[in-house]
């Protein structure tokens, strides 16, 4: 695809999120969501591979159905309240429909089935876009309506998403599917906390974007599509292999890495509201997720299978790694540093709480 076309589409995606962020009416929110969906579709199927086109069609159908649900909620509110305002109180039916629509857009339980299959059919850069930036607009809507929808329903769906994300990733050998279930689990943590503290939920969402972006970029750099291919990264680039292990452990929430911040502030927020049962469920789901994170780390560093010496040079030629400094390298270095050492920023972040 032409670079100028890609830049225009990316600009439209950014503008659509800004429209959703600045909207106070359901009409503008629906416009922003539709612009966001229609702009990302050509990027997802830009390679015109059969699997990529299939994933794009699945993504389009899911997003169209969820947008129709949100539009129906807006029309019901217009009929009941004679207003397009997002802050207008919702009745019980509209609250449940809107919650399910946002779960469908974010890939949360019980509407998570489409996300792993769609992500498996895309490249790592397309999966990065789908797992991070495409979640921003639905997350903004969820933040806007979290005070007018059922807190118990949102917390329950978040806890179940953590369990489903941890359980679903146990028997996976494809890195993209593992990242899909990891996304489901992390967004479950965020939704469980969002009703009690929007500030904590936003911090967790930013940390999730940084960690996921780092993992996707490293895997894209090394063409690491399954667990068996992870071992070659250490042979070809020892520094990047060790960074991948640390970022994966950070994604699992092990201290003293950045990912531990999400677990700590989430549990602190829930315990301050005397929610012991959700905390226990989240911890169990986090342990399930930690198992396949450790599998990735084990295959990346400890399982060093015998390799031919010429494989080192062929791998470097394919990946384009020659040690030169580029924007991609600088971006990956910054994200890796934030993913590993970001816990040092906790005092500065908590001072504004």
Curated annotation (Swiss-Prot):
Membrane topology note: Multi-pass membrane protein
Annotated keywords: Electron transport, Membrane, Mitochondrion, Mitochondrion inner membrane, NAD, Respiratory chain, Translocase, Transmembrane, Transmembrane helix, Transport, Ubiquinone
InterPro entries (alphabetical): Complex_I_Subunit_2 (IPR050175), NADH_DH_su2_C (IPR010933), NADH_UbQ_OxRdtase_chain2 (IPR003917), ND/Mrp_TM (IPR001750)
GO CC field: mitochondrial inner membrane
Top-level taxon in the UniProt lineage: Eukaryota
Xref: Pfam families: NADH_dehy_S2_C (PF06444), Proton_antipo_M (PF00361)
Cellular compartment(s): Mitochondrion inner membrane
Record-level Gene Ontology MF annotations: NADH dehydrogenase (ubiquinone) activity
Residue intervals passing through the bilayer: 4-24, 60-80, 96-116, 139-159, 198-218, 241-261, 274-294, 330-350
Function: Core subunit of the mitochondrial membrane respiratory chain NADH dehydrogenase (Complex I) that is believed to belong to the minimal assembly required for catalysis. Complex I functions in the transfer of electrons from NADH to the respiratory chain. The immediate electron acceptor for the enzyme is believed to be ubiquinone.
Family: Belongs to the complex I subunit 2 family.
Protein name (record): NADH-ubiquinone oxidoreductase chain 2
Organism classification: Eukaryota, Metazoa, Echinodermata, Eleutherozoa, Asterozoa
Gene (UniProt): ND2
